[in-house]
Amino acid sequence: MSAREEKHQRGSKRPAARREEEAGCGSWEQADLGNEERKQKFLRLMGAGKKEHTGRLVIGDHKSTSHFRSGAEDQKISDELEHQYQQSMDSSLSGRNRRHCGLGFSESETAEEKAPPPPPEHPPKTESESESSSEVSSEEEEEEESDSDSASDDDTAHKRKPTEQSDKDIPDSKDPKSNYKMLFVKSTGS
């Protein structure tokens, strides 16, 4: 072909024969799939099958919907649904199903529950020391019990979380994760 013919072909439309071939790609009815049963199954799976109507459908003709509810029944059903909704919200917010909270879920209660107990105030004693000071230790325990009964809730919370003391040492940061990381770094460093 000459350059003139190529230029003419580039600007011209495609011949009609190609259009017919391309249109054949979407017509599944003409595909040879074997017997009629396989063809119908293929068309149904592809969503191109003709749907057969089994009869006339009348809205509200079903037996279960043929009766009308009274206002009292509607109110009772809506109250029951609201009650069920409130129960599910309360149970999900109470933390009963914590496994559904997702990654990174943290709550102040979980930190208190999993926190290790504080170390004993007195160093462990040997057997000879413990026998001689058994009377003294029982008096000390009684004093500690009376002190703990009179102590406020803030003091007990303070004993449970020794890391809260260092919150004052850390510069103010509004991100609680940042504070936690800094506390962890400070506690491991010293």
Swiss-Prot record:
One Pfam entry name: SMAP
Region Disordered: start-end pairs: 1-190
InterPro entries linked: SMAP, SMAP_dom
Range of residues in the leader sequence: none
Origin: domain of life: Eukaryota
Bias kind Basic and acidic residues: ranges: 49-83, 162-178
Acidic residues bias: start-end ranges: 129-154
Residue stretches of biased makeup (Polar residues): 84-95
Similarity section: Belongs to the SMAP family.
Protein's UniProt name: Small acidic protein
Species this chain originates from: Xenopus tropicalis (Western clawed frog)
